[in-house]
Design a protein with these regions (language model features):
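GNAT-family acyltransferases
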Residues: 1-130, 143, 188-193, 197-231
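Conserved active-site tyrosine of GNAT-family acetyltransferases
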Residues: 167-168, 195
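Conserved beta-strand-loop-alpha-helix junction that forms the acyl-donor binding cleft
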Residues: 155-164
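Conserved GNAT acetyl-CoA-binding A-motif
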Residues: 146-156
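Glycine-rich acyl-CoA binding loop
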Residues: 133
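Conserved catalytic-core motifs of GNAT/GCN5-like acyltransferases
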Residues: 174-188
Length: 231
């Protein structure tokens, strides 16, 4: 650990301390899905199905927002999402069906510290636990580390939201700890669990994703031959 002229330990100097970029992308193309900057004109009809018409009410338990009560409320929400720069919202289009089956965002975007959070994840049941869902996360991670030049990628969730925590760890996030009494929402107290991936971990994690997503990792029934954690 380096020392300053007072003989105090300090963090390592950075070869590049410039700020990261703000997200500004229309399309990230993958083998199983595309990740598209969310717009009302392109995505409202498909999103309406899993946000309202056939929404799963239990999916909103750990979200700060409540379930939508009308089509107009969904439209207004998506209009806000389209205009927002922080968070910056994306739609996930599954190539198998051609339909948008999920949304997520880059949020808590902090260019000065080159830190950003993955959040606001809402997936239709038909997208959950699929290659397309995993690839969408991979595509956005790649964009964050390789195009935006960020150092830290965060994931946070209610400490009681085990599916979210399990998803984070499967995707390669490291558990960092728990912020107790971190928030109040829906009249409840929330402890928040924090996870992260840092830039030095990305090259190895990228290889894991690419190996797992390769067509030869899946049999004729679409079942994985090796899990993501096995790579």
């Amino acid at each position: 650990m380096p020392l300053n002229h007072y003989q105090q330990e300090v963090g390592p100097s950075l070869a590049d301390a410039s700020p990261g970029k703000m997200p500004d992308v229309a399309l990230l193309e993958g083998r199983y899905c595309s990740v598209e900057h969310l717009t009302v004109a392109e995505h409202y009809k498909d999103i309406l199905d899993f946000y309202f018409t056939n929404q799963i009410l239990s999916d909103w338990t750990y979200m700060y927002a409540d379930p939508f009560e009308s089509e107009e409320a969904v439209r207004q929400c998506l209009e806000d999402y389209e205009q927002s720069q922080n968070p910056y919202f994306f739609a996930i289009r599954a190539k198998a069906s051609g339909k948008v089956l999920g949304t997520f965002s880059l949020m808590a975007i902090t260019p000065k510290n080159r830190s950003v959070e993955m959040g606001r994840v809402i997936l239709a049941p038909t997208l959950q636990k699929t290659r397309a869902a995993t690839e969408a996360q991979y595509l956005l991670m790649k964009y964050v580390f390789e195009d935006l030049n960020y150092r830290r990628y965060e994931w946070k969730c209610d400490s009681l939201n085990r599916p979210s925590a399990n998803a984070a760890m499967r995707l390669g996030f490291t558990y960092e700890g728990r912020f107790r009494n971190h928030a109040i929402y829906k009249g409840r107290s929330r402890d928040t669990d924090w996870f992260s991936i840092i830039e030095s971990e990305w090259p190895a994690l990228k290889k894991r994703f690419e190996n797992w997503l390769a067509p030869e990792n899946f049999d004729e029934k679409g079942q994985q031959r090796r899990s993501l954690r096995d790579y």
